[in-house]
Amino acid sequence: MLKARKVHFIGVGGYGMSALAMVLKQRGTAVSGSDVAASARTQRLAEAGVEVHIGAHDAAHIEGADVVVYSTQVPEDNPELAAARARGLRVLHRSELLAEFLNGRSIAVAGTHGKTTTSSMVACLLEKAGLDPTILLGGDLEVIGGTGKAGRGDWVVAEADESDRSFLRYHPRVAVVTNVEPEHLEFWEGSFARIQEGFRQFLRQVQPGGLAALCADDPTLRSIGQELRNQPGVVHVVFYGTHPEAEWRAENIRPWEKGIVYDCVRDGRLLGEVRLPIPGRHNALNSLGALVAGDYAGLSFRQMQETLLSFGNARRRFEVWADVDGIRVVDDYAHHPTEIRATLAAAREQAGRRVVAVFQPQRYSRTHWLMDEFATAFQDADVLVLTRIYSPPGERPIPGVSAEALARRIQANTGRPVAVISDQEEILRFLLAEVRPGDTVITMGAGDIWKVARALAQALQSRAVTRTASSGSGRPAPGSGR
């Protein structure tokens, strides 16, 4: 495990970075960090005793540190990173530090979609069972009050990110892989075949005798799983899903008032009913992956069944902001076409509801590579608003790639008009004029589009309070004769 007097994190407000910073702090290491903007995560770190610098990066921020941690988003000319290298300090990529946690008794959740929800489920299963795991997530989880927690138990639960090849540093005891699709192609030479090979290599790195829990509904994972099974003694492969080859199956998936319910079948034997307080067929698959991992860790099905019944998902995963006057306001991190389809389908499951969607595309490169898939991802949206493309610093626009171009492609496919609105206040005005009782309004994207959901929820609640007050003041006073 890392030995250091003080560790400094550049970009400490990121989900993965804040998780690592919190765990080190809770384990007694002196920690500092910097970020250009304050957030709930930087505030939590400061309250925990982390020395947090907000604003422009400055070499002075690394004073006293003997280890400096950075992420892929940090450019080489960052003054703190440059100073650390110049001073000969130990400099670690985020994934190198995470690898020190994941190369022991660990459960790593990988996949193009569903990592945060699935790893959150695994974390909750082990936490509620009293195993006190160390937890490192890519989203805020209510049960631990953030993204990271240093446990006293042997198990570590974490996300294994494929986006920048980070997961190739890890050697977990258990790997849960949800799916494999084209995404983050800029890190994989634009090749889906290279992404597939990356997942193949990651699974080969599971500790000997460990477990690979793979979603059988994904053809790439079925193929890789069969390859691994043909290499006896390397890793134990278990398939889960709805596919006939799955040992752990979700059957009879159906909605219930709070989310979804399904029959959990293992090796042809009914274990029982699993009820999730979150909607979506994809979440049935996510929970199955978590059940397989929990079973490996020694948990009983009954224990896991009870924990999932009260599961509170990570923030920005079908997060309900308000339900006012029959209008439900939801926010979701969905930013890939497959995630968008699954999220809109989950919203559509609520019978009789019109779906009003607001999508913030992220990255010109993603929009360019997946334009055809995005064009067909919004069939379940009755009303659709697109914002400008949300792009990280340093990414250059690509000619012909814009929200307007995407809107034209979607409109040609659905036959329904698509509004393109850049300003969030203007989006709010549009929604307030458009929505009606019975609607589900859902904001989607990896950027700051959640602020629209928050603003809409506040506006609807304020409108309801004002209307109630007005109707109350209009009642006749006792004895007025009206």
Swiss-Prot record:
Stated name of the protein:
UDP-N-acetylmuramate--L-alanine ligase
Positions contributing to ATP binding: G111, T112, H113, G114, K115, T116, T117
Check the record and name the InterPro entries matching this protein. Mur-like_cat_sf (IPR036565), Mur_ligase_C (IPR004101), Mur_ligase_C_dom_sf (IPR036615), Mur_ligase_cen (IPR013221), Mur_ligase_N (IPR000713), MurCDEF_pg_biosynth (IPR050061), UDP-N-AcMur_Ala_ligase_MurC (IPR005758)
Q: What class of enzyme is it?
A: ligase
GO CC terms, sorted = cytoplasm
Pfam families the UniProt entry points to: Mur_ligase, Mur_ligase_C, Mur_ligase_M
Catalytic activity from the UniProt record:
UDP-N-acetyl-alpha-D-muramate + L-alanine + ATP = UDP-N-acetyl-alpha-D-muramoyl-L-alanine + ADP + phosphate + H(+)
Q: Which UniProt keywords apply?
A: ATP-binding, Cell cycle, Cell division, Cell shape, Cell wall biogenesis/degradation, Cytoplasm, Ligase, Nucleotide-binding, Peptidoglycan synthesis
Tell me what gene encodes this: murC
* Any one GO molecular function term: UDP-N-acetylmuramate-L-alanine ligase activity
Cross-referenced SUPFAM superfamilies, in alphabetical order? MurCD N-terminal domain, MurD-like peptide ligases, catalytic domain, MurD-like peptide ligases, peptide-binding domain
- Would you kindly state one Gene Ontology biological process term found in this protein's UniProt entry? peptidoglycan biosynthetic process
Write down the superkingdom of origin. Bacteria
Pathway(s) the chain acts in: Cell wall biogenesis; peptidoglycan biosynthesis
Say which family it is in: Belongs to the MurCDEF family.
What EC number(s) does the entry state?
Answer: 6.3.2.8
Q: What does this protein do?
A: Cell wall formation.
Subcellular location per the Swiss-Prot or TrEMBL entry: Cytoplasm
Major place of residence: cytoplasm
